[in-house]
């Protein structure tokens, strides 16, 4: 089942709708939810290396659809790629996934990050954690490690590929722009820098259709029989 045991459902439409609602709900409380794992990582055996061979139709209608809905309807700001490859191209360094589909087709404008110690590959080569230039070129903006992890101390190929021209300074600047854009529009940073006041920050937690606040319940008499109208766009 790969990472599917962590997912919302087996139905891509239902998954997308629920994920979009969750992302919107988190955003109301100044939290940017990360949707993952992008994509087609279903197999438990060798899940960090297994190659998911899938047709474009199945990819778009089943494995990408939930992510598409979460991006377009949920306004997701952050995406995490999987460990392994899809059709031979490791997702952490897949330009088709991270740029063509996610950013150009769906209009995603946030950050993309790898799973912990993910690998990427150049065409025809074995994948490795040190191959991070393909990640940067694909607009996978953040290589996820922790400060005490061995991978943090390993060399990578970024400088080498910059010097030989495979990776450009502009591509790295694009990654930086994605990360800074993500940070600069976050309500927490806007408030910390005095760009929005506390009242504006509090207003972002405003009540919306379908929400139930404590203030709504204060006039209810627990001894009194009756009915309550619950309404909202997401109520079915």
Where are these regions (language model features)?
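Glycoside hydrolase catalytic-domain context in secreted enzymes
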Residues: 1-236
